[in-house]
């Protein structure tokens, strides 16, 4: 019975992963992610029902589009598998007894699934385009508010702590919209700050601090490796160019998931 439950959760996670790849591709292009059918990005042919099974479709089709025979990037398969494994890992770590499932545990798991969706989409878009998209941040704050309401009503949590987070979120959002919208660098930093607030709401201060620490270490290693690469290849890449290649949102997402696990 347990094996069947874990397989089902893995498949649900893989389906989420399939949706994440769609969202990562469409959100920066301002395309609809809910009503428009999936299509091949190479030939634009709409995909059939049997073309969209997570993992299986990729394997059966040999990593190619059924219609134009162009290769499909392996990131689709990788993200679906990773998503499935992470969903299973979270279920296992929460120690949910499948023979005595409690509503509170199911609610917590659902909130965690929504939160992981936020991280995956942020990471995917940032890795591809180095952007923290506002629609994704808006989604993050919406699920945060719902989660706060749940904690305060059901678990009688201290609401003042979360109110402080929301106040900071609104202040940064106002600054980003009014004062700093002309500066791409500041806009990106503000997006990172808003992302950190959502992380803190869902995972608490301790995990957030560890996430920031591990991300800082990762960024430092990245910069050091780039400097060494510059010296070896005698590259003229400036610090400004290194900054432009630095995907902090991606690193934050990855380190936060690893810290949770």
Briefly describe each language-model feature range:
Residues 1-261:
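A membrane-topology feature that recognizes alpha-helical transmembrane segments
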């Amino acid at each position: 019975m347990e094996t069947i439950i874990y397989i089902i959760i893995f498949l649900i996670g893989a389906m989420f992963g399939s949706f994440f790849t769609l969202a990562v591709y469409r959100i920066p292009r301002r395309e609809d992610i809910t009503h428009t059918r999936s299509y091949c990005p190479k030939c634009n042919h709409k995909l059939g029902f049997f073309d969209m099974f997570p993992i299986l479709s990729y394997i059966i089709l040999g990593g190619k589009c059924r219609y134009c025979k162009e290769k499909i990037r392996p990131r689709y398969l990788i993200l679906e598998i990773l998503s499935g494994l992470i969903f299973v890992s979270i279920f296992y770590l929460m120690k949910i007894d499948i023979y005595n499932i409690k509503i509170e545990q199911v609610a917590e798991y659902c909130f965690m699934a929504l939160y992981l969706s936020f991280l995956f989409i942020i990471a995917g878009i940032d890795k591809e385009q180095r952007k923290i998209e506002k629609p994704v941040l808006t989604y993050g704050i919406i699920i945060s508010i719902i989660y706060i309401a749940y904690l305060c009503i059901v678990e009688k949590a201290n609401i003042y702590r979360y109110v402080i987070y929301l106040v900071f979120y609104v202040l940064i959002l106002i600054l980003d919209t009014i004062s700093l919208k002309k500066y791409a660098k500041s806009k990106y930093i503000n997006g990172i700050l808003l992302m950190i607030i959502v992380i803190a709401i869902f995972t608490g201060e301790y995990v957030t601090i560890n996430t920031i620490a591990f991300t800082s270490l990762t960024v430092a290693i990245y910069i050091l490796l780039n400097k060494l690469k510059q010296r070896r290849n005698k590259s003229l890449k400036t610090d400004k160019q290194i900054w432009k290649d630095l995907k902090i949102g991606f690193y934050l997402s990855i380190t936060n998931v690893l810290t949770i696990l």
